[in-house]
Amino acid sequence: MSKYTSDSSNFGADGPFFRIIREGLEGLADGEDYFDLLADDVVVEYVISVPGYPRRVDGRQGVIDLYSGYDDYMTVHTADNLRVYRDPEASVAVLEYEVHGESVLTGRPYNNRFASIITVKDRKVTHWRDYLDPIAVFDASGWPKRSSLR
């Protein structure tokens, strides 16, 4: 088992999301799983997101709480197309990547693209600013229902 989650979860040591983030932050941050990469006082901002999702989460435990039920809604099978841009003087990395999976609730495919601006201090992520494609989330979740568009 990873430090904060099971190895097989989307965020665990064997999860494709963690593997691509670990690859993008190689040499900058260390951790046994996604949550272990985060500093205790990390700030995570969701600049482009979906309705009902928080715009900001403070602290590692807050991020763990936010994602505690994620595996019940979405399964990520693969993550790819990683592009990494770094400013070593500022300890900042910009990661562009894609995730592919399916909605657990609808069985619909989930294919999303992300851009994450990540600040690292003392080998832990201290700030994470995330941009995602909300339409991909809507498509996977079946929202809005087609009948409501008539």
Regions found by a protein language model. Give the residues of each.
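Short, low-complexity N-terminal intrinsically disordered segments enriched in polar/charged residues
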Residues: 1-40, 146-150
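A beta-strand edge to alpha-helix "cap/lid" segment located at domain peripheries
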Residues: 2-13, 69-150
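Short, well-ordered alpha-helical segments
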Residues: 15, 61-64, 112
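Hydrophobic aliphatic residue packing
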Residues: 21, 42, 47, 63, ...
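A solvent-exposed, acidic/Ser-Thr-rich amphipathic alpha-helical stretch
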Residues: 32-91
